[in-house]
Design a protein with these regions (language model features):
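Intrinsically disordered, low-complexity linker/tail regions enriched in polar/charged residues
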Residues: 1-350
């Protein structure tokens, strides 16, 4: 693969593996194949019946801060799909064209190439088709059939779990004591999270939830592993959230969202390095692809970061030698001029 050697504005350009969190997982949690990836999730994808007298397993987990060696989190899997599908990138021609239907198609194509825990991801991944009134009943019936067929126990009582991915619509307490989680385009099918797991969600993802609470244009994308409790009652066993802009570009904070929106408004071409399992402070806020043959890092700093994160970010910026740094609250520095690449760009070595 020579994509990283191409002119940054070339259609064949690909970021270096080490420019995102994928680099730290290749060979340890993710194995690259010719046309996709194999990986092991840190969560089981099968439910095994308990023997008589066996203790009830611990409550579901939101996400593991540090996955076991050789395994990856749901967040890392979601970032992998986003990067494979090219949703971490932006060019002005995408304006107004990147909707849930396009996103779902690209993610579905990537799911066919990946194998979590040796199973084809496409066989257990549920993403709702875009809502259309005339087709809503048929789509809902198809989802119900898919969930039932995937989670039906076999002769030994072992049943598969399903990975559900979609934009969060609402999360509300219900009389059972659970929290009912609804996803857009499939609100007829609730997924239940017990209060303990949802309190953990609120703790782990508090910055993302707060960012969404004050900016309705941002999106929260849920990736969850669900299992059948009874007929049509599906419980969340593990859950991860990522925050994205209205154009589905992942961001780690409101500060990054401001940078991404400024770039989109300026008509720039760029990509957003995704953290996977790494600390997001290790990566630039965005990387321009239209300012010359080389990548151009854009850094954004917020005064509201904790001291540890701030020190890591500043050390990473120094290591990269970045020249463009925007401190929020101050005027954004001028962006480097846009440079149109040659019609037949040559590989750039070094």
């Amino acid at each position: 693969d020579t994509g990283a050697d191409h002119h940054a504005g070339c259609v064949h350009f690909e970021p270096l593996v080490g420019e995102s969190g994928l680099g730290s997982l290749l060979g340890s949690g993710i194995t690259a194949r010719e046309s996709g990836y194999d990986f092991r999730l840190a969560h089981a994808l099968r439910s095994v019946p308990r023997r008589a007298g066996e203790a009830t397993p611990a409550t579901a987990t939101v996400r593991e801060p540090r996955s076991a060696p050789g395994k990856i989190s749901l967040r890392a899997m979601t970032h992998l799909l986003w990067q494979q599908a090219g949703i971490d990138r932006w060019v002005p021609a995408m304006q107004g064209k990147r909707n849930w239907g396009v996103l779902r198609y690209r993610l579905s194509e990537c799911a066919r190439l990946n194998h979590p825990n040796t199973a084809p991801l496409a066989d257990i991944l549920l993403m709702a088709k875009p809502f259309k009134e005339s087709e809503a009943a048929g789509h809902a019936a198809a989802r119900a059939t898919f969930l039932a067929s995937c989670t039906q126990p076999d002769r030994d009582g072992v049943s598969r779990k399903v990975i559900v991915l979609g934009e969060l619509k609402s999360a509300t307490p219900v009389d059972s004591g659970d929290v009912r989680v609804l996803l857009k385009h499939m609100s007829e099918q609730p997924f239940l999270a017990d209060q303990k797991i949802w309190k953990r969600v609120q703790k782990v993802y508090r910055p993302l939830l707060k960012a969404k609470a004050v900016d309705d244009m941002l999106r929260l994308v849920v990736t969850a592993i669900v299992s059948a409790q009874t007929e049509r009652v599906y419980r969340i066993d593990a859950l991860s959230l990522i925050l994205t802009t209205e154009n589905w570009i992942p961001v780690e904070s409101a500060a990054e969202a401001e940078l991404i929106r400024a770039l989109v408004a300026a008509g720039r071409s760029f990509y957003k390095p995704l953290a996977f399992a790494s600390n997001p402070a290790m990566f630039p806020g965005a990387v321009l692809r239209d300012s010359g043959p080389k990548r151009f890092n854009l850094e954004v700093i917020s005064a509201f970061e904790d001291e540890k994160t701030g020190k890591l970010r500043m050390a990473s910026i120094k290591d990269r030698g970045s020249k463009w740094i925007w401190t929020l609250g101050e005027a954004m520095p001028p962006l480097p001029p846009r440079i149109v690449p040659p019609r037949s760009p040559q590989p750039v070595v070094g």
